Curated annotation (Swiss-Prot):
Assigned protein family: Belongs to the eukaryotic ribosomal protein eS24 family.
Protein name per the record: Small ribosomal subunit protein eS24
Compositionally biased intervals (Basic residues): 101-119
Residue stretches of biased makeup (Basic and acidic residues): 90-100
Summary of the function given for this chain in its UniProt record: Component of the small ribosomal subunit. The ribosome is a large ribonucleoprotein complex responsible for the synthesis of proteins in the cell. Required for processing of pre-rRNA and maturation of 40S ribosomal subunits. Part of the small subunit (SSU) processome, first precursor of the small eukaryotic ribosomal subunit.
Gene Ontology terms describing biological process: ribosomal small subunit biogenesis; translation
PANTHER family in the cross-refs: 40S RIBOSOMAL PROTEIN S24
Organism in which the protein naturally occurs: Macaca fascicularis (Crab-eating macaque)
SUPFAM superfamilies: Ribosomal proteins S24e, L23 and L15e (SSF54189)
Alphabetized HAMAP family for the sequence: Ribosomal_eS24 (MF_00545)
Gene that specifies this protein: RPS24
Length: 131
C-alpha cells in the first residue's frame, strides 16, 4: 500500500436499523491508477478499527483527469447483518454467496413444461416433477 493515496470519508451516517455505518468515500491518488477496492477496504478497516470482511465498497467513479475517485461504502456491525442486508451480487464479489447453477438443458426443459399449463398450476410444474 502506498502512502501517497489518501482516503477521506464524508456524509457519514450510522444506520441503526440496518446495523451499519454508511458513507461516501473520496480517494485522492494523484499521478496513480485507480486504487483497488481491496486496498480501500483495508485502509477503511484501519481507520474504523474493524476487519475488512464487514466492509463493502462499490460505485467508484474516477473524475475526469484522474487523481480523484469517489464511491460509496458500508461497514456492518457483524458479518451476519451483512449477509442479511447486502445484495447477492455484492456478497458474491466477497466470496460469501454462491449461486446454484442449473444446466441449460434443465432450464429449457422446465420452460417448456411450464408452457403446457396455465395459471397457478405453473408453480407446481416449475417446482419439479413429483415422484
Amino acid at each position: 500500500m502506498n502512502d501517497t493515496v489518501t482516503i477521506r470519508t464524508r456524509k457519514f451516517m450510522t444506520n441503526r436499523l440496518l446495523q451499519r455505518k454508511q458513507m461516501v468515500i473520496g480517494v485522492l491518488h494523484p499521478g496513480k491508477a485507480t486504487v483497488p477496492k481491496t486496498e480501500i477496504r483495508e485502509k477503511l478497516a484501519k481507520m474504523y478499527k474493524t476487519t475488512p470482511d464487514v466492509i463493502f465498497v462499490f460505485g467508484f467513479r474516477t473524475h475526469f483527469g484522474g487523481g480523484k475517485t469517489t464511491g460509496f461504502g458500508m461497514i456492518y456491525d457483524s458479518l451476519d447483518y451483512a449477509k442479511k442486508n447486502e445484495p447477492k451480487h455484492r456478497l458474491a464479489r466477497h466470496g460469501l454467496y454462491e449461486k446454484k447453477k442449473t444446466s441449460r438443458k434443465q432450464r429449457k426443459e422446465r420452460k417448456n413444461r411450464m408452457k403446457k399449463v396455465r395459471g397457478t398450476a405453473k408453480a407446481n410444474v416449475g417446482a419439479g416433477k413429483k415422484k
